Amino acid sequence: MTDHARPHLIEFPKLGLSDIGYISVAENDDKLLPFAIQRIFWTYYTPESIVRGRHAHYRTQQVIIAATGRITVTTEQAKGDIQTFQLENPQVGLYIPPFCWHTMLYSHTAVQLVLASQPYDEADYIRDYNQLRALWQQA
């Protein structure tokens, strides 16, 4: 395992006007994303009592965006570094590096859009928190 960047917010350009609406764009050749997008997925209608995530990845990097609603993301990295982020602006994304445990809570109206650096591969998921802690200790 190598040392990776910390979770951090990325602000995408906001183009438009209040009377016509706005657009924000993420492209593979811009300097905002630290990876090329290989997969995009979204979640919606998640009950407010459900905690999603509860995993980390070996290789995959992600940017989580609250397209609508509010998402509370809690991240944990090696050495107990815990951060909590409130996502509620569609022009702001949260970068999640590999080996970063993360959980999400949603407002009922939240639509979560995720940009990912890898295609889906179940073998890339670390779903056991104790296994991740052991990997952190080996680093």
Which role does the model predict for each range below?
Residues 75-77, 106, 114-116:
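Residue-level recognition of conserved beta-strand positions in structured domain cores
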